[in-house]
Amino acid sequence: MVTVLMHDMFHAGVHFGHQTRYWNPRMKPFIFGVRNKIHIINLEQTAPMFNNALFELNKIASRKGKILFVGTKRAASEAIKEAARSCDQFFVNHRWLGGMLTNWKTVRQSIKHLKELETQSQDGTLDKLTKKEAIICNRKLEKLEKSLGGIKDLGGLPDALFVIDAEREKIAVKEANNLGIPVFAVVDTNTDPNGIDFIIPGNDDAIRAINLYLTAVAHAISEGHQKNALEI
């Protein structure tokens, strides 16, 4: 089972929070101190909390659970997509569309339309349209792929969310809360941790830190899949 060492977290800058003036007092239990007006996160708490989150994600994956990676900020967008794909999971890495979870029926119709356009693009149907019609269809396909491409094979609601930057993705977190879907999230010092089932106190801006979280999560999920395959 994959585990992450405090030493690796330190070198990835997981302990660097936000400037003190932006802090959320509810993160006080996870803060070690202040350096140069920046809150320092207590890695002695983060390490066991992250490793516990990895253990739980591994269990969900071993039961064939579906995990939705959510991270729409520029620093995380590409890494979110790569990590989710590496462990055969799902992702939202551009704007979260309100109702993606709570209005799944409507989202499912949009996914159906996306797949129809993909088929038409591949079988030459779009080539038979006028130039203007083809441009409109291709733009629509591009837009739908950008917003829904990472969930087009989800097939229903996910069993868990893994979120980079719970503050930015609070609409996704709230929707998951409303539906009773467990939320695993990296929570920085500027964020209210309420609504997060598995809190990972840590830097949610540094690319090295983001890569550390995503690599470990993808490995934990892949190991869970292997466990399931062995049991079968």
Swiss-Prot record:
Organism expressing this protein natively: Baumannia cicadellinicola subsp. Homalodisca coagulata
GO molecular function: structural constituent of ribosome
UniProt-listed PANTHER family: 30S RIBOSOMAL PROTEIN S2 PROKARYOTIC AND ORGANELLAR, SMALL RIBOSOMAL SUBUNIT PROTEIN US2M
Gene Ontology biological process terms, A to Z: translation
The entry's keywords: Ribonucleoprotein, Ribosomal protein
GO cellular component terms, semicolon-separated: cytosolic small ribosomal subunit
Organism placement in taxonomy: Bacteria, Pseudomonadati, Pseudomonadota, Gammaproteobacteria, Candidatus Palibaumannia
Protein name listed in UniProt: Small ribosomal subunit protein uS2
InterPro entries named in the record: Ribosomal_uS2, Ribosomal_uS2_bac/mit/plastid, Ribosomal_uS2_CS, Ribosomal_uS2_flav_dom_sf
